[in-house]
């Protein structure tokens, strides 16, 4: 366990550690570790259909589909096929494994003869031990004249009379990048069919801050950490990247001669575009589902929460406190609520309010709580919480998941360095976050129950991830 000095780091809200905490009468209540699954399943059964648990819980309490993903076969003699097949097979397997909803059958259990066409499927060999699978993904890939063609099927091998669940054909350039995209598309089709109609995330992007170029710039990568590339080249300090719901614009905070301002990058134009300057310190933009932007601004003195339209016009002040109030995040399902961090009672705590600034509610009741992010179904917040913050306390920044209505919470990370800036995937099954567990700040992902933790970045310091909406 890491021990933190009582003095907050520079990323924390100024002067908040010198004030005293206040207790809540409606305190956030822990769900004890041994009762996590039972308590949350009961809660979800009482408040939402089972589909919501699939979206949020990554299979807790739900039987996983047993799935075999056979290596696709070559359908042409082109020598380029070998490398392209490996790229496809590796990518498809990783996508299905990352989904968190399958019991993937080990390839060591597969029959010697794996199918490349429907006529080659040996049903008894697949639906009995050792594979004993319910579903089988298989197909073939061929490359010729610089083009690649792929045929893929998903079969219910327990239903020999009518086995086909999915059949797809794809064609693209015969390059590794194009084949990766095809694998992502096929994986997402399988996930959609077998995952309760929830769209897969294999084609989504993650935006983050990286120092590897010598400056804090905004970068992007595929959901699995592949294809990392720099977006901004401002040669300054850029923070808090937030992608718009349609994926066309990226809002972030950056410091220039005028101070901290909200900046905007257009992916349609592949360049920075103008955005109004508001004066004061302007930080942590957040998009609403309908394209408004909430952010923290000190234009009126103390940092408070403001909201503007997509072009930066029609600014409205939502909070009016000596806070400071920072880090807003919209309810991504309804757009009618905003969660944010405030130091109005001492140490920073998480609050919610209506999108017009009314109905203020305190969510956390102790410690040091920051970086809230709302789940796609609007039911949960995930955030970083040092529950025992203070001199002499063995505090640790861990990630928590809280049901907003009941204030019941579950701890997702356990004393694995500093963990911060969690962000939900669009399917609600995954969370990406920043962690210092490897000895430097890097981007990690996990299932929304805290399992299947994977490191996505390695080079340089990488922080503040934001997952695309789709």
Regions found by a protein language model. Name each.
Residues 206, 250, 293-294, 338, ...:
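Hydrophobic beta-strand positions that form the internal "hydrophobic ladder"
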Residues 210-217, 233-236, 253-262, 276-281, ...:
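A flexible loop/linker signature enriched in serine peptidases of the S9 family
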Residues 34-45:
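Bacterial N-terminal signal peptides
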Residues 222-226, 266-270, 309-313, 354-358, ...:
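Short loop/turn segments that connect beta-strands within beta-propeller blades
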Residues 201-202, 245-246, 288-290, 332-334, ...:
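Residue-level detector of Asp-centered blade-edge/turn motifs that repeat once per structural unit
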Residues 52-53, 117-189:
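Amphipathic beta-strand/beta-sheet edge segments enriched in Tyr/Trp
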Residues 58-124, 140-141:
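Short beta-strand->alpha-helix linker/helix-N-cap micro-motif
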């Amino acid at each position: 366990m890491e021990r933190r000095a009582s003095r907050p780091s520079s990323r924390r809200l100024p002067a908040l550690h010198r004030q005293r905490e206040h207790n809540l009468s409606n305190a956030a209540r822990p769900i004890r570790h041994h009762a996590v699954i039972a308590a949350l399943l009961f809660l979800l059964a009482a408040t939402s259909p089972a589909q919501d648990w699939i979206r949020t819980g990554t299979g807790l309490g739900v039987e996983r589909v047993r799935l075999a993903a056979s290596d696709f076969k070559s359908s042409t003699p082109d020598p380029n096929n070998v490398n392209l097949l490996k790229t496809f097979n590796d990518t498809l397997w990783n996508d299905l494994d990352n989904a968190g909803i399958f019991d993937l059958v080990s390839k060591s259990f597969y029959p010697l003869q794996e199918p490349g066409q429907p006529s080659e499927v040996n049903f008894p060999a697949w639906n009995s031990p050792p594979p004993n699978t319910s579903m089988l993904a298989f197909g073939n890939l061929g490359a010729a004249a610089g083009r690649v063609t792929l045929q893929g099927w998903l079969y219910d091998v327990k239903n020999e009379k009518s086995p086909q669940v999915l059949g797809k054909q794809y064609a693209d350039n015969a390059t590794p990048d194009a084949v990766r995209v095809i694998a992502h598309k096929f994986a997402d089709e399988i996930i959609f069919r077998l995952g309760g109609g929830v769209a897969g995330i294999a084609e989504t992007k993650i935006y983050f801050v990286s120092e590897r170029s010598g400056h804090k710039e905004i970068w992007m990568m595929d959901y699995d950490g592949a294809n990392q590339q720099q977006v901004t080249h401002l040669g300054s300090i850029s923070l808090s990247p937030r992608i718009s719901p349609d994926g066309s614009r990226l809002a972030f905070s950056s410091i220039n001669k005028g101070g901290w301002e909200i900046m905007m990058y257009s992916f349609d134009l592949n360049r920075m575009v103008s955005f109004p300057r508001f004066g004061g310190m302007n930080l942590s933009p957040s998009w609403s589902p309908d394209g408004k932007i909430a952010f923290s601004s000190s234009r009126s003195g103390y940092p408070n929460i403001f909201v503007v339209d997509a072009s930066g016009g029609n600014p409205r002040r939502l909070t009016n406190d000596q806070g400071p109030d920072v880090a807003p995040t919209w309810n991504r399902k309804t757009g009618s609520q905003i969660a944010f961090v405030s130091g109005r009672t001492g140490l920073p705590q998480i609050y919610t309010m209506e999108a017009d600034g009314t109905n203020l509610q305190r969510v956390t009741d102790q410690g040091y709580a920051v970086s809230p992010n709302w789940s796609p179904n609007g039911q949960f917040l995930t955030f970083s919480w040092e529950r025992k913050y203070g001199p002499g306390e063995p505090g640790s920044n861990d990630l928590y998941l809280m049901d907003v209505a009941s204030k019941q919470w579950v701890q997702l990370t356990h004393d694995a360095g500093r963990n911060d800036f969690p962000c939900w995937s669009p399917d609600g099954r995954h969370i990406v976050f920043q962690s210092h567990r490897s000895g430097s700040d890097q981007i990690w992902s996990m299932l929304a129950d805290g399992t299947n933790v994977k490191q996505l970045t390695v080079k340089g310091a990488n922080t503040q991830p934001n997952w695309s909406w789709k």
